[in-house]
Design a protein with these regions (language model features):
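C-terminal amphipathic alpha-helical interaction region
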Residues: 161-365
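Polar, glycine-rich mid-to-C-terminal structural blocks
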Residues: 14-74, 78
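Conserved alpha/beta core surface patches that mediate binding of polyanionic ligands
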Residues: 83-103
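Structured core elements
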Residues: 85, 101-103, 108-112, 243-252, ...
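Active-site loops and adjacent core secondary-structure elements that bind or stabilize anionic groups
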Residues: 11-12, 145-152, 156
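A generic structural motif
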Residues: 6, 114-121
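Generic beta-strand/beta-sheet core signal
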Residues: 29-32, 82, 89, 105-107, ...
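Single conserved hydrophobic/aromatic residue that forms the stacking wall/gate
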Residues: 2-9, 13
């Protein structure tokens, strides 16, 4: 943006703000996947609510334009690093916000919602098409304006756009519950999961956007909707089945083996010293028994609910996806609680697979 005029920069930002606000649901859909649902809103990833970060100074510039005020910048601020021997330098006035899905940094916008395993093509398609649509709308509004009135018309259009779409601008912490509440008050989408987002793919305004610009036909649009749903369902079906297999074939046998060793140790101690305490072994044996019983019970529920969700695949794919998201994932989280607790009590030598500690911190030949 540095190579363009001030008015062109303002128009570029205006176009982006309107495009993101009008088609925030499509941007969320473009990054929707089972894996990305886990990522968004945590681990330095942006939240599922689409918003734009402009930084304090640029936001003040737009506010001044909206109110027909003259913007007075704060000037260059020296960075205080607390060391006199190091050179002084000017603080970056664009600042940074790693919790923003769509952030302006320096001279560009960054879209940060895309997961590492997904193609950048999908958000590129949506962003480029949305901006093209906005430019087309603005062209229709300005095409009959005489040359001597163009500057004033562009300024008024800029003011109007800021007033209508400033709700999408948010420079705060996107992880807080307060922002989620504020986003709902502003009327922004909060599409937490893929099954929440995908039905909007075929909304009338979205279908009109993508078909009018000859990006997709009606059939292509609906086929992509179904393919995305099917991929989501298949991914969670595989994950649920993998969890069942790991628990049944690996973890539960390991728990049983360790409980057997504990019982043998306690019996051996008693055979040598009849009055010796085996309370530690007994307590650990009791705890592992409780955890294994809970695991078996939760695992049966997981298998039943997975079968129920899978039954709906051919009848109602969206219903199946919602069952996987709201029921099967919840079951998996419950199984995970008792499984993680049991793993923490079992020696590494008995577990048939590496622990997180070994995976993260050990180096094997």
């Amino acid at each position: 943006l540095h190579s363009t005029s001030r008015r062109q920069r303002q128009m570029c930002i205006r176009d982006s703000i309107k495009a993101v606000d009008d088609y925030a649901d499509l941007l969320r859909i473009s990054v929707a996947s089972a894996g990305n649902d886990h990522r968004l809103g945590a681990n330095e990833a942006p939240p599922a609510v689409v918003s734009i970060f402009l930084g304090d100074e640029l936001t003040e510039v737009l506010k001044a334009i909206e109110n027909d005020e003259f913007f007075v910048g704060h000037g260059a601020v020296q960075m205080d690093i607390g060391a006199k021997v190091l050179p002084h330098f000017v603080k970056d006035n664009t600042d940074r916000n790693r919790t923003s899905p769509f952030a302006f940094t320096g001279n560009k916008f960054e879209f940060r919602m895309l997961g590492s395993s997904s193609s950048v093509a999908n958000p590129n398609i949506i962003l480029n098409t949305a901006v093209a649509e906005v430019l087309s709308q603005f062209y229709e509004e300005l095409k009959d304006v005489p040359a001597d009135g163009m500057e004033s018309a562009v300024h008024e259009l800029l003011k109007k756009t800021i007033k209508e779409h400033k709700r999408i601008i948010f420079n705060g912490n996107g992880y807080t519950d307060e922002w989620i509440e504020e986003a709902e008050k502003r009327g922004l989408y909060n599409l937490v999961s893929t099954p929440d987002a995908l039905p909007h793919f075929t909304d009338e305004k979205n279908e009109k956007l993508l078909t009018s610009h000859h990006i997709f036909t009606h059939a292509e649009l609906h086929s992509r909707y179904e393919i995305k749903l099917e991929n989501y369902v298949k991914t969670l079906h595989i994950e649920a089945g993998t969890m069942v297999e790991i628990i049944q074939k690996d973890l539960l046998p390991a728990v049983t083996t360790y409980m057997e060793k504990l019982a043998q140790t306690a019996a051996l101690k008693k055979s040598v010293v009849p009055d010796i305490s085996v309370s530690a072994e007994a307590a650990l044996l009791t705890r592992l028994t409780e955890l294994s019983e809970t695991m078996v019970k939760d695992l049966e529920r997981l298998k039943e609910d997975t079968a129920m969700a899978e039954y709906e695949v051919d009848k109602n794919l969206l219903k199946s996806a919602k069952l996987y998201q709201s029921v099967v994932l919840t079951d998996m989280e419950k199984v995970r609680v008792s499984a993680d607790a049991a793993e923490a009590l079992i020696p590494d030598s008995i577990l048939p697979y590496p622990t997180y500690g070994k995976l993260l911190f050990s180096i094997s030949d």
